[in-house]
Structure formats: structure tokens, C-alpha cells
Design a protein with these regions (language model features):
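Conserved class I S-adenosyl-L-methionine
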Residues: 1-56, 156-177
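Class I SAM-dependent methyltransferase "Motif I" SAM/SAH-binding loop
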Residues: 67-69
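Class I SAM-dependent methyltransferase SAM/SAH-binding core
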Residues: 72-107, 113-115
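Short conserved loop adjoining the S-adenosyl-L-methionine
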Residues: 118-123
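A short SAM/SAH-binding and catalytic strip from SAM-dependent methyltransferases
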Residues: 127-140
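A short glycine-rich, Lys/Arg-flanked "PGG" loop and its adjoining helix->strand segment in the class I
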Residues: 141-155
């Protein structure tokens, strides 16, 4: 067997089923949005600082933040780059981003109300794409196709690391014991 013979999308979907994973509807995220904004936006975090440093976004670059939530990365990125496209399927999360956009007078943020499953023909390309903990999708192939079509330079993906979802070997490899 060679790698091209492996259907990674099928394996991924089987894994999601085995973990009893399901995506929350946008209305659940709408309800969580104010508290998440309070707890996450503008708060120091080793994860956030490490990811922003690794992304090394330049002033002349654009960023597409997929699953942007309440603006955890949108706000600091908008303060350092040309433009940020904040995409989320929760209107409540986008409402939080809008509040921060107004508070900090960041006119370089564009809100996009879409899900991974939606048609993305009108989503602009960006130099840098970020999908932080927002890649638990139903169709891995479709996600990869969207990332490829929208990225001009770099893509940064991170995943959730809850124990029920990942193999113990992954935790050992990344040095986590919590």
C-alpha cells in the first residue's frame, strides 16, 4: 500500500465517529460569545503569543482567520497587518469582533458570516490563513481544498487537544501531561 491508496477523509470521519464528536450549532456559540470574549480577547496566553510569533505576519500582509471566535487573534493581527478577514459561522462571535473593531477603531477588519460547509466563492484570498482550533469539520477534503484556494503564502492550523479526541502518544510527543 502506498500513501495515495489511503483515504484520509474516510479515516478522519471514522475517528470523529469513534470520539462521538459533533459540531455545536452556531446558536450555542452565540450564547458563549460574550463570556469567551471576556476571557480570551486581549488576555495574555502562552498559546496565543507562541502562535502569533510563529505566524510572523508582516505589515503589508492580509490574514484570513477562519473560526475567528470573539476576535482572540483578529484584534492583535489587525493591529499589525494590512487587513484581517474574520470568518465565523456564529453571528454572536462576529458581533463580539465588531464591538472590538469599533472600540479600537480598526477599520481593516472585514466580517464574514460563513461556515466550513458554505460556498466560499466570495471569500477573499489572503497572504496568511489561520484556523486556530476550528478545523473539526465534516469533510476534510473540502477543508483542504478551501485552504489551498484561499492561501497566497502560508497556512497555520492548530487542533484541539482534549484527551477524548487524541491518542496518548500525541500528548507524549508534544510534552503534555495535563
Amino acid at each position: 500500500m502506498i500513501i495515495n491508496d489511503i483515504n484520509f477523509n474516510d479515516l478522519y470521519q471514522q475517528h470523529l465517529k469513534a470520539c462521538n464528536h459533533y459540531n455545536l450549532p452556531p446558536t450555542k456559540w452565540d450564547k458563549k460569545a460574550p463570556k469567551m470574549a471576556e476571557n480570551l480577547v486581549g488576555k495574555p496566553s502562552r498559546y496565543n503569543e507562541t502562535l502569533l510569533k510563529a505566524m510572523n505576519v508582516q505589515p503589508n500582509e492580509t490574514v484570513l482567520d477562519i473560526g475567528c471566535g470573539p476576535g482572540t487573534f483578529v484584534i492583535p493581527l489587525a493591529q499589525q497587518c494590512q487587513a484581517v478577514y474574520a470568518l465565523d459561522y456564529s453571528q454572536g462571535m462576529l458581533d463580539m469582533v465588531q464591538q472590538y473593531k469599533e472600540k479600537y477603531q480598526l477599520n481593516n477588519i472585514t466580517l464574514l458570516h460563513k461556515s466550513w460547509a458554505d460556498n466560499w466563492d466570495d471569500v477573499p484570498q489572503a497572504d496568511v490563513i489561520l484556523a486556530s482550533r476550528s478545523t473539526l469539520v465534516d469533510d476534510l477534503d473540502d477543508m483542504i481544498e478551501k485552504l489551498q484556494s484561499k492561501a497566497k503564502k502560508r497556512v497555520f492550523l492548530t487542533s484541539v487537544t482534549q484527551r477524548h479526541f487524541l491518542d496518548e502518544g500525541v500528548f507524549e510527543a508534544i510534552g503534555r501531561d495535563d
